[in-house]
Amino acid sequence: MRPSGRKTDQMRKVSFERNFSKHAEGSCLVRFGDTHVLCTASLEDKVPAWLRNGGKGWITAEYGMLPRATGERMRREASTGKQSGRTQEIQRLIGRSLRAVVDLPALGERQISIDCDVIQADGGTRTASITGAWIALHDCLKWMEARNMIKVERVLKDHVAAISCGIFANQAVVDLDYLEDSAAETDANFVMTGSGGLVEIQGTAEGKPFSEEEFASLMQLAKDGIAELVALQKQAVAG
C-alpha cells in the first residue's frame, strides 16, 4: 500500500494555473499534489555571446527552492555564494528538455529564460518543473506570436513532460511523493515528448540493483503517466 493510498499507476492530482505572474511573458503555477512550482518564461532580444550571428535562438533555465519549501528551512543558495550540484543538474535538465521540442532557428536570435521556483516540495520537483515550464514557454511564444514576432507552430514542435517512477515496497509505482522517494528501492525520472520520443531517463538503484523486467514496468508507467500529463497540457492551453 502506498502511503497516500494511491494505486500503483495513479498519479497525484495535477493542475496548471496559467498567467500566474502579470510581468512574465509566460507563466504557470504547476501543482503535482503537494509539490507546487512557479514557472516563468522571460523573453530577451539577444542570445549568449557564443551564439551571436548564428541565426538561431536559445532556451535556458534556472531552478531554485524557497527556503521553507521543505519541512525545515534551507539557506538560500545565494547566501552561500554558489549553487549546489543538484540545482545545476536540474536546471540543465529543464533547459535540455525544452530545447528538445523547440526549433531554435525559427525562434530567431532571441533567448527565452525559464525560471522554476519551488514554492512547496513533496517529491518530483524536477518533473513538475519540466511539465509546468512547457506551459510557460508555450504562453511566452503565444505572446510573441500576438506581436508578429514568430509563428508558434513553427517554433514549438511538440509537447514535453516528465514523471518520476520507482520501486517502492517491491512494487513499481508512478509519481513518487517525498515519503515514497525517500524509501524507494529504485528511483527514476523520465522525460518524453508528446509523440512518445525519449528525451532523458535518469535511474538509480538504492541498496540493490533493479532488473530489466522492473525497468520495463517503470517505463510503461512513465509512458502512460506522460501521456496523461500531455493531455492535461493540451487541455490547459486550449482554455
Swiss-Prot record:
The keyword tRNA-binding applies. GO terms for biological process: rRNA catabolic process; rRNA processing; tRNA processing. Phosphate binds at residues 86, 124-126. Its EC number is 2.7.7.56. It catalyses: tRNA(n+1) + phosphate = tRNA(n) + a ribonucleoside 5'-diphosphate. It comes from the Bacteria. Keywords: Nucleotidyltransferase, RNA-binding, rRNA processing, Transferase, tRNA processing, tRNA-binding. Transmembrane segments: none annotated. CDD domains: RNase_PH_bact. GO terms for molecular function: 3'-5'-RNA exonuclease activity; tRNA binding; tRNA nucleotidyltransferase activity. HAMAP family: RNase_PH. Phosphorolytic 3'-5' exoribonuclease that plays an important role in tRNA 3'-end maturation. Removes nucleotide residues following the 3'-CCA terminus of tRNAs; can also add nucleotides to the ends of RNA molecules by using nucleoside diphosphates as substrates, but this may not be physiologically important. Probably plays a role in initiation of 16S rRNA degradation (leading to ribosome degradation) during starvation. Belongs to the RNase PH family. Homohexameric ring arranged as a trimer of dimers. This is Ribonuclease PH. It comes from Sinorhizobium fredii (strain NBRC 101917 / NGR234).
